[in-house]
């Protein structure tokens, strides 16, 4: 479970780094926060979780 904070930190870094470069995605975020948020904006999160072994349980 020690790697979970690292994964969260990396995700925050990626989000902060990608936000300025992805204007269209940032504009769509307010509309997605209700239900589409988990489907639209978190596939990379699941990928990193699986890659690190923190979420998938592999």
From Swiss-Prot:
Similarity comment text for this entry: Belongs to the conotoxin T superfamily.
Function of the molecule: Probable neurotoxin.
InterPro entries named among the record's database cross-references: T-conotoxin (IPR031565)
Disulfide bonds: none
Extent of the signal sequence: 1-18
Listed GO CC annotations: extracellular region
Organism for this UniProt entry: Conus imperialis
Top-level taxon in the UniProt lineage: Eukaryota
Keywords tagged on the record: Disulfide bond, Neurotoxin, Secreted, Signal, Toxin
Chain positions listed as propeptide in the UniProt record: 19-28
Pfam families membership: Chi-conotoxin (PF16981)
Keyword rRNA-binding attributed: no
One Gene Ontology molecular-function label: toxin activity
The protein's name in its UniProt record: Conotoxin Im5.4
PTM (free text): Contains 2 disulfide bonds that can be either 'C1-C3, C2-C4' or 'C1-C4, C2-C3', since these disulfide connectivities have been observed for conotoxins with cysteine framework V (for examples, see AC P0DQQ7 and AC P81755).
